[in-house]
Curated annotation (Swiss-Prot):
The lineage of its organism: Bacteria, Pseudomonadati, Pseudomonadota, Gammaproteobacteria, Aeromonadales. Pathway: Carbohydrate degradation; L-rhamnose degradation; glycerone phosphate from L-rhamnose: step 1/3. The keyword Acetylation does not apply. Binds 1 Mn(2+) ion per subunit. One of its GO terms (cellular component) is cytoplasm. The gene is rhaA. Its cofactor is Mn(2+). It holds the Pfam family RhaA. It comes from Tolumonas auensis (strain DSM 9187 / NBRC 110442 / TA 4). It is found in: Cytoplasm. This is L-rhamnose isomerase. Belongs to the rhamnose isomerase family. Mn(2+) binds at H262, D294, D296.
Amino acid sequence: MNPNIETAYALAKQQYAAQGVDVDAAIAALDNIPVSMHCWQGDDVTGFEASAGALTGGIQATGNYPGKARNAQELRQDLELAMTLIPGAKRLNLHAIYLESEQPVARDQIQPEHFANWVKWAKKMNIGLDFNPSCFSHPLSADGLTLSHPDAKIRQFWIDHCKASRRISAYFGKELGTASVMNIWIPDGMKDLPADRLAPRQRLLAALDEVISEKFDEAHHIDAVESKLFGIGAESYTVGSNEFYMGYAASRNVALCLDAGHFHPTEVISDKISAASLYVKHLLLHVSRPVRWDSDHVVLLDDETQAIATEIIRNDLLDRVHIGLDFFDASINRIAAWVIGTRNMKKALLRALLEPTQALRDAEAKWDFSSRLALMEETKSMPWQAVWDYVCARNGVAVGADWLATVKNYETEVLATRK
């Protein structure tokens, strides 16, 4: 290790110790907090279905940066490089459209065998897998309704797809020894004002109950449901609203997914974590960066990312909150996007772990809000960067922006050959 990194770390450790912060404990904790990286950044949410069509569901990947993965082998190769540039525990989040099969497979017929290569790869990488049914970009989602569709046959197709997805998720958990969190997000909604807001929600409620009727060991599989405010083409009404899924998660004992881009522009999910934790056992987070809408920009080390991490750590929720990322930017190098976003999430977690939380709470308990604010602000200028550099170095990961050269070299030698 570079002696300058060790020296800076030793000095930082002394400063944190003076505030009552155990840096070694913080690093040990960080090493074991997995962040679930999303596979769909690597190919702009295209997937590997034989009949893959245009991206639908009110979501968009904008840009045309060269070198996107064209098959599972290339996607895994790209992910491997990205993961070597990120310290600590990681997971991979897969969508159903990332199956591998020599023959076309209907979505309601997908099987664990179609994801066997992903499991084999995950074992090699020593990571867990998470999963999602893909209720978009399909002829039977063209009406903008899936699990809430008034046509019973179409609705049943999507119910069966979600059921099949749960079996795959449970297979992941059993094979890898770590529970797969399977998140159900549907694009169901309407462009203009509906005459009946209740009936689609009644259908969705019944459909979800059928989806989760088969029981699995929570050690292998955890169900999650995700709300959204609106999507393109569903501006006026979303069937799976925040209130719908909050009630569903609490009443059915499933996890609630909070996506940073799925609320009003001035709402933040960091404020929702503590409230939701009182009513649901598990929370799934989709950390993203909405720019004026659910644009899924690459995650920054900004105030909200930091606030999300801080809420998890302050409230001791690591065993109940599952951290996932959800962004897809096709205008920049896709591997760089993964690395930037995931490292930023890790940095936010480290900063939260290095916070003198007890001192803040003591000041608050005494109604000493001046000290509370002063300590919060002084914490921002503590030498957490020296600790981060040390974390990267001890994990054999590039320090600072040194990783960028590796990505640029890979772009020249590998990505540029993909036409």
